[in-house]
């Protein structure tokens, strides 16, 4: 059976978190624009699919970058389409400062 987890991450530090997902987990991700319900302010949401064994690592990574980030973890039954693979990705050109 297919087993994966999807994370919805809402944070003002979305760029830093996204960079770390790429560098540390070698995963692709998507940014969504959102509107906060209470304050009606603009938000960015990161959506990423990872294996269950990567959950502890990504939670720690998020906590390090933004302890106040809102994170929702959902079960993913299937992931299809361009850009999704568990194969090794290209070497990174980004270097974290």
Q: What are these language model-derived features?
A:
Residues 1-97:
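Positively charged, small/polar-rich N-terminal and surface patches that mediate targeting and assembly
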């Amino acid at each position: 059976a297919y087993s994966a987890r999807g994370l919805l991450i809402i944070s003002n530090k979305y760029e830093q978190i996204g960079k770390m997902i790429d560098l540390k987990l070698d995963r692709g991700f998507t940014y969504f624009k959102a509107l906060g319900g209470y304050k009606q302010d603009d938000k960015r949401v990161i959506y990423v699919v990872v294996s269950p064994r990567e959950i502890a690592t990504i939670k720690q990574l998020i906590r390090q970058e933004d302890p106040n980030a809102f994170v929702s973890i959902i079960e993913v039954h299937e992931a299809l389409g361009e850009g999704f693979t568990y194969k090794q990705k290209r070497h990174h050109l980004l270097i974290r400062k």
